[in-house]
Amino acid sequence: MVTLGDITPSFVKQKALFQTSEDLLFTVSSEGANPLFKFNILSGEITPLLDGPECVVSFSMSRDGKNIAVHLAQMERPDEIWLLELNSEKHFRRITFLNDEYMSSISCNVPEEYHIPSDNAVIQSWVLKPPGFNSKKKYPLLLQIHGGPRAQYGYTWFHEMQVFAAAGFVVLYTNPQGSQGYGHAFADAITGKWAEPAMNDLMAAVDYILELGFVDPEQCFVTGGSYGGYMTNWVISHTNRFKGAVTQRSICDLSSFFGTSDTGWDLEADFHDVPWKNPELYKKWSPITYADQIDTPLCIIHSENDLRCPVEQAEQLFVRLKYDKKPVRLVLFPEESHGLSRGGRPDRRVERLKLMLEEFRVKS
């Protein structure tokens, strides 16, 4: 389960509910959205109830099954509660207005969607432009890479993306191969080769956006957390096109990750082997193997109590780069878990964003 916040739920966190003795309500992950469906267990018919460009985070039904309260995420605003009335017209309306005052006090853009061709796939991507965007100017680019790996970005309001856009960055985020929501073959494309073809997809997306003419190719930055941190490490060890990078709660050594993470054993399903039987395979797909090729200035952010991606992953990478006299900085957050960015102590969550902005601004 991926913690909700700046990422679309990819493993269905909402339990399916019976509306009647025959009709089952459920959500799925589909191309950046999280639609709500009704399934009739007798006829096998599937009926969409909510299938627009939005995400049903969770829902609750009235006793008679005629009304459904929906926790809905949209790109235009932070989440609110909506009411779906299953009368003859299927009326859907918002019933909370928790963020209206806040939204009226800020200036932000809605992300623009792109479908970018890459190796054997078309990659759904979004670009969030700064407020007051001027197409004649050249802006710095920030590539954001999601975790998972089998997760997805989508149709939600991302506070983190808005922070960077407000600071003057064009923010690019994509669902490369390995993401969920596009079928089994798409999600399984990285099986046995974690960084590929995701690397090609990410670079294709950057190339595509650069061709649009409003990004400065000399001012490109990259960041990501968890698997996104793994990919950040991989990207900067295989290209020098980025001026700076921030890797968060990341993985650099798959062999040690297998033995120290609370879910490390799950790598066997992806690599069809274990590190003590096939050390070369795990070494091949570990970014630290290629650390000598890293020249991009790197800031490593990690939580000391991270059980998913233990802090030793950050320490390994930091020591290796420091030993090689590479430009690297390590920032550790005490008492925090893998979910610092989404559920950490509020002042530390703010400090994390400030650190990232500082890191990118210094180099821009």
Locate predicted features.
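Multi-bladed beta-propeller domains
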Residues: M1-K15, T20, S29, F39-V57, ...
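Residue-level detector of Asp-centered blade-edge/turn motifs that repeat once per structural unit
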Residues: Q19-S21, R63-D64
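Hydrophobic beta-strand positions that form the internal "hydrophobic ladder"
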Residues: L24-L25, I68-A69
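Cap/lid segment of the alpha/beta-hydrolase catalytic domain
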Residues: K90, T96-E218, G225, F257-D266
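Active-site-proximal cap/loop segments of hydrolase catalytic domains
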Residues: Y173-S364
